[in-house]
Amino acid sequence: ILAEDDPKTFDVKLMSVAKPLRIDQLLNKYPYEVSGGQKQRCAVARALITNPKLLLADEPTGALDSNSSRELMEVFKELNENGQTVIMVTHSIQAASGARRVLFIKDGKIFHELYNSGFSDYEMGQKIANTMQMLQRGDIR
């Protein structure tokens, strides 16, 4: 049993992550019966069920449609507001726009960063897009 929890505690934890990720209807299905996006949300649930202090997410929205991506980013934002640290690797401006801090990494080194000091997701997305344009032009080194 996961993390040595008793089955009843596990079921409560399972539903607490399954409902926000909209996978509660998938719990009795086999992997071949669900879509790629549903599998992605199940993977997130597996990562969250033990309530880790640090969540590492590598392209968590890669297999998701835009609605599911937005919902997942809301889950991550809520987790972060409740004290969990979320470190996410992404190429998605939309996914990064909700972050408090965005690091731009090139050749394994941090070469620029942005802090979100109260910007809306739209405003932060614009800052990220502008920074990416400057990086591509070579304006930031």
Question: Each PLM stretch: what is its role?
Answer:
Residues K8-Q25:
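Conserved ABC ATPase "signature" region
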Residues Y30-V34, Q38-Q40:
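Conserved ABC ATPase signature
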